[in-house]
Amino acid sequence: MIFYMPVKVFSEENCVTAHSAELAALGTHALIVTGRSSSKKNGSLDDIITALETHKVKYTLFDEVEENPSAETVMKARDIGVNCGVDFVIGVGGGSPIDAAKAIAVMIKSPESSWELMFDSSASPLHIPVAAVPTTCGTGSEVTGISVLTRHDIHTKMSMVHKVFPDIALCDGKYLMNAPKKVIANTAVDALGHLIESYINSAASPFSRMSVNEGLALWSSCKPYLSGKEELTADTAKKLLTASTFGGMAIAVTGTSVPHGLSYTLTYEGNIPHGAAVGIFQSGYLRRAEKSDREHILSLTGFGNTDELGSFIAALSPVNVSRQLLERAAESVLNNPRKLASCPYKADKEVILDIIGGVICSG
């Protein structure tokens, strides 16, 4: 058994300010990698800039990361970073900016290399330091080595083959407080997917399942808010973010499985948000698991059966998807031996079609 999670995690209120010295110690010139607006609205960008200025650390802002970032975006940021002389990267936002930050850190260290380096398993590139500041409750990317990028050349999403764990993660639930409910819903469903897929996984271990158990208990305690019965509180925001971090710790060991593999086609071809695309396959995936594992997860999440789980996800994060797109997703994952191997039960064509057959769609 191996448990490797080298990220130093600070999880507390105002942690960017409280640990500004640790952030500033990563280098002398930061490339702040984020999306176009959310980090400006939730206050995280201001906190980071203040922290850097307090310690007289220079910074350059790259705020052009799109949802499901592309290799082309990584290369654009790499060129800016190299030209400005940055020596560390801060990813702030959801999974897209943090995943992009990891890939950018690799490419800045290899300024003459082409984008193919990110997917070249024969190479062993170095990278500059990375800090992560998550502002959604789904990615878990702040504690994983994975960077998922869009490959327009092959019309899908793919993980960079090189593992890049952030040096530090600064986790503060306050950045969720003004997020749109839809964003929280979709990312919370993604976190649930990480937790379920890590537990029902060929690579699951006592260490990864320990993280899952903690994460599911926290996630379940937030159901009154997620279902619309309560308003978002600071305590609930903290629990949602921490559940997501536990999910990241779990998939750092196991990786994700079939539902994530199925989701990529829906996101790329159907423009369906990642969390929502992952969520619609969870009940079908869990239904096929060993009875003891299935009952354990249902017990921790407070659902009586997989149908209840599926209905909750469908109400929380509704999706309208055609049968044709679902079938293309099935075909794609059946040609992904790595995702199939991560499933602890035989994931043949019959099983995959059964999983997509149980999808609950809106509209």
Where are these regions (language model features)?
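Active-site pocket-lining segment
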Residues: 265-320
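Glycine-rich phosphate/pyrophosphate-binding beta-alpha loops
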Residues: 138, 248-273
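Short glycine/serine/threonine-rich phosphate/pyrophosphate-binding segments
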Residues: 16-19, 40-44, 71, 96-101, ...
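Carboxylate- and glycine-rich phosphate/diphosphate-binding segment that chelates Mg2+/Mn2+
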Residues: 146-254, 344
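Glycine/threonine-rich beta-strand-loop-alpha-helix active-site module
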Residues: 72-174
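C-terminal charged capping/lid subdomain of soluble metabolic enzymes
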Residues: 298, 302-363
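ATP/NTP phosphate-donor binding region
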Residues: 1-88
